[in-house]
Amino acid sequence: MEMTRGICILGATGSIGKSTLDVVSRHPDQFRIVALTGNHRVAEMQLLCQQHHPELVVMAAPEAAQQLRVGLGDAGLKKIQVESGPEALAEAARMSGVDEVMAAIVGAAGLLPTLAAVEAGKKVYLANKECLVMAGNLFMERVRQHQVTLLPIDSEHNAVFQCFADGKGVRRILLTASGGPFRTWPAEHLAVVTPDQACAHPNWVMGRKISVDSATMMNKGLEVIEAHWLFDLPASRIDVMIHPQSIIHSMVEYVDGSVLAQLGNPDMRTPIAHALAFPERMESGVSSLDLAHGPDLQFEAPDLQRFPCLALAFDALQAGGAAATVLNAANEIAVQAFLEGHLPFLRIAAVVEDTLGELQPAAPDHLDDVLAIDQLAREVALRHLARHGSGMQ
């Protein structure tokens, strides 16, 4: 009988974390939950603890951790260790009982614990884009150095991975994008978009930050940068195609004219199950795709005037240096301001563009350089935010 594989889920209370737990719970003979981490959703984390009984839980803030300790004590789960803070996050990722790490913390906060998993030689399921956007060269160097198995979880990159084979004869990859909730809106209506409207994605269930990124198409821009590092292709061989139905998750075109596509219902449990089982397959709980009765599949080129964030991401990738680190930091600041009602939707791109225009740092040699550039870019973005932010009308 095979031993179960110990798994740590970084970002367990987020949408990817919950989908991972759903898949894992279908295969109790294969997995055991060793560690879970979360940000501030104490009640949700307590419920996960009652369902999955991890050895360790890490919350971002000490207050949340203390609340959780009390709640677990009341529930008779005092044996579960509860910690807080960045170092505890990293420790969860490198625990001796952990074999595999689902890296699903959103944003720059996911970089250090994911690197900790890599340096500890764990198998890493990468759902955090920012590791590659902020520190692509350094991150992939560590992956090679520690001979780590790195499997992509983003539906687009997972689709490319499934179609990529050995990478021989690839002409280009085509990342598909839904176009978000505002693809067909009249341009004048975009000026008064609210956070709730931006977070209402037509096809996918996602967190608020990534939903806004989808609405601006910055999400696809970050995925272009991620694809560059994962598949070692220049920007000129990575294209984006709008596909509103989100049935084809991405395509790979070969020099002989063949185009391989991966299809499936828009449910993150599919790429998660693919990665968890690779090179085998496992049941995910996702329903079969019904092509006969499903929607017609449509495609269109993205309008870069309508989606300037996508153009900014391509520019940052081609500029090289630390431009992608600056892009990511400025976008996180701008999106948070929009979600809090301090910045109009259409000014998100302006904050990012102005920050990119002011900072052109060289490529970082060390992780400390990445973190310093990230911090500087946030400070510059906040200054531009003060100029562009006028609140929501």
From Swiss-Prot:
Catalyzes the NADPH-dependent rearrangement and reduction of 1-deoxy-D-xylulose-5-phosphate (DXP) to 2-C-methyl-D-erythritol 4-phosphate (MEP). One of its GO terms (biological process) is isopentenyl diphosphate biosynthetic process, methylerythritol 4-phosphate pathway involved in terpenoid biosynthetic process. NADPH binds at T13, G14, S15, I16, N128, E130, G207. Pathway: Isoprenoid biosynthesis; isopentenyl diphosphate biosynthesis via DXP pathway; isopentenyl diphosphate from 1-deoxy-D-xylulose 5-phosphate: step 1/6. It comes from the Bacteria. Mn(2+) binds at D154, E156, E223. It holds the Pfam family DXPR_C. One of its GO terms (molecular function) is NADPH binding. It catalyses: 2-C-methyl-D-erythritol 4-phosphate + NADP(+) = 1-deoxy-D-xylulose 5-phosphate + NADPH + H(+). 1-deoxy-D-xylulose 5-phosphate binds at K129, S155, E156, S178, H201, S214, N219, K220, E223. This is 1-deoxy-D-xylulose 5-phosphate reductoisomerase. Keywords: Isoprene biosynthesis, Manganese, Metal-binding, NADP, Oxidoreductase. Belongs to the DXR family.
